Structure formats: C-alpha cells, structure tokens
Amino acid sequence: MVTEATTNEPLPGVTVRVKGKDTGTVTDMDGKYSIKANKGNILIFSTIGMKQIEKAVTSGTPINVSMEEDNIALEQVVVIGYGTVKKSHLSGAVGSVSAKELNGQVASNAATALQGKIPGVSVASSSGDPNGSMTINVRGISSLSNNNPLYVVDGAFGDISMVDPNDISSIEVLKDAAAAAIYGSRAAGGVVLITTKSGRKDMPTKLDVNFFTGISQTPKTLKVFNGEEYSRFARYYKLAGDGYGAENGATPFIGEGTDWQDVMLRTAMTYKANATISGGSKSGSYSSSVSYLNKEGILRNTDHESYNIRLKSDYSFFDNRLTIGESMIVNLTKGSGYIHQDTMFDIFQFPSVVPVYDPTNAGGWGTSNDINLPNPLAEMTVNDERTETTKIFLNAYLQAEIIKGLKYKLNVGIRKEHTKWRYYKDVYDLGTFGKNDKPDLEEKSSTWESWVLENTLNYDRT
C-alpha cells in the first residue's frame, strides 16, 4: 500500500515499476497495487509532486511505502523564450495556464479556452460565427496593422487554432520584451508558448478517453413589434405598403405574425470527443491523440466541424547527452454558414407581417416589397457558403550536450495550410432586395507553406 507521509492517506495513481524492466502498474483509489517481481528486484514508486522511492524485494510480504512531498518539484517552472526558469527567479512578465485549468472544456480551440485565464490578456471573438477566429491581445493595441502575438507550439512557430485544449500541458504568455527577446521584432505583440502533453519514461501504456457535450443559446431576445403591432404602427404613420396589410388604408393584420428571432436563433449543441494514448520506455516517451468536435452555431444554418491528430515523442541516448524528438499536428476543419456584419440587424428589422414562406414566389420564400432587406432565413439558405481547411504542423529537434552545461539544439519546423472555399447561390425572389433567375457556383482554393530552421546554444551552469 502507498500512503502520503504527513496525512497517512492512501495515494492513488502512483506509478510502481520494476527497475530495469518494462513491468509496471498504478495504485488504485485505496493506494493498493499488485505487481509481479522476483526477490532482489528493485521497485520504484513515483508520482508528480512526491519524492521517488526505491524498495528492494526481500520476501513475499507486502511492500508498503510512505511518500513525502518533493518541494523542489512542486516549485513551478516557467517556459520562456530562451529556456526554462523557476517562477520565483523570474523577473519578466509571464502569465501561465496549466493543463488542469484547460481540461474538461468544450472549447473549439486553445484560444477559446484561454478566455479569462490570464490577467492582462484579452481574448475576444470577432463575431458569433462558430467558424470565426479569436483575437488575442497581450500588450493591448500598440499598432495600426497587426497586434497579434507570436504563437510557438512545442518550440516551433505554430497556430493556436489547430491545438486541442485537451492536448495542452501548459501555456505561457510572455508579456514583456525581456522574456520574449530571443524572438526579436516578431514578438512585438507578445509571445504565446504552447507545450503539448508528453508521455513519461518507464510508464506503462495509458489510454484516456473523454466525451463532452454542451449547449449555447441566447438567454434573452429583443422585444420587437408582432404582426398586429407592426401593421398598426405602419398604418398610423402612413408608411409605404408591403402588401401584407401594413400599408395605409389596407385591412389591418391580425395575429402575432412571424417572430424572426425565434425563426433564426436556436439552442445550439456542441459535441466533443478526445482519445489519448501515452507511455514510455527506459529511453523515451510518446503521446498521441485524436479528437473530434461538432459545434452548431446559435444562428441557423451555421456549423463547425473539426478533426485533430497529434503525435509527439522524445528519446534520449548516451546517458541523456543526446535527445531527439518530434511533434506533429494535423487539423481538418469544415465550416458552413453565410454570415455578414448586418445579419443580426436584418433579423431585428425585418417586418413581422411577412411570412417565412410564400409558394407564389420563386424559391417559395416570403418577401417584402417596401424594405430593402432579405428574408433572413431565405438569405441563409439560398447562399450556401462552405470552407474546408487542412493544417499540418511538424517540428523535429535534436539536442546534444557538448560539455557539461553547454547544449546545442537544432530545430526544424514546417507549417502548411490548404483552404478550399465553395459558394453556391440558388434561385430566389426576395422582393425589393433582388432576385436570382439561375443558380451560381464559385469555387477557389489557396495553399500556404513556411519552413523554419533554428540553431541555438545554451549554457547553464550553477
């Protein structure tokens, strides 16, 4: 049985392994474990935040251990541009977020999960579009052109939107010039360092599967005229007619009419699944994951879907004097929905006396003849806009300790992005807003690619 030294409480999740072999297990909720070992074997007990213990197998009696806190391990280590440093020794302005704070969120990407986590860092959405991007400001708006921070994923320039929050080990935000000095002018807007999860050496293979679901909805809608109120208002002020009873002198409209907010807004569902497999041997560690996200927009006919694959491994040789590793992320996103800056304004202003459907019009949509606005649902339906983006991130490194304290690191990074855009416009008649007598189809694609090669020397001797 494994217990905590000060409280004598059982410790679950402690890794127990036979030294020099791949045999291992993990303690249960009661701190108990079972492992096959021969007399003379050494059992190693290890877990985060506790001092590692080694015990020799001398007989068939149970081996009980009491683990003490490792104060050095518990002192937070912060990643900065030119290495790592204990937080107590840090002079620069750095904000950090741990995996514990990010796990369990139904967030589409790491930028969304970062909202409200670090003081002084602003994270906002440019629109309510589920396919829209997030804007992150680390140092405020200091430039008229570009205030975006530089994103570094596992040591190479990357893209925060392609990282699944469940795959993140930590996020460090470098706010001042000293912490981000190694990146030069590219770090004018700050630096966001993302470290993805790794396996652990001498750890048995572990499988984690998570499933999340959530909802998004509009908690309150605006109060607008119903059909009868709109008709009475229009007739009283002698507004131009729309053919549905709002014109001066026409028969008043009777009833509620169309609630366009109810037609266009919905309770949107979000589904997310993630599976991670990790482990390690005596000389290395590995971690890989797959994830899927399906996110509906609050606005009808808007959806976002994404697939993520991540691979990461690290291996050491010659008593850890040579280390090699790689990190790869493949991200596929699919988005649909025709949204512009006036979409919500159109929903609030479109007359409630106009029905959603009218079979006498081309396309079967209800129209207005006295307002230059489209039927909101018709506009979202006849304009079918879709995007599909594939992003590939690959980073490989080699690190060698030349002499004690002096390390050379070679880093190679590749980023590639391919986007396909498709826009289809169906036949419609939307009154004074306009009509389309024959369908239109437009397609285009673009490809973007970048390479980075870095060589660094780091000397650390205390």
Set out the residue ranges of the language-model regions:
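Short, small/polar-rich motifs associated with maturation and membrane association
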Residues: 1-311, 316-317, 322-329, 393
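Surface-exposed loop/interface segments of Gram-negative outer-membrane beta-barrel transport/assembly proteins
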Residues: 201-257, 298-304, 308-393, 409-462
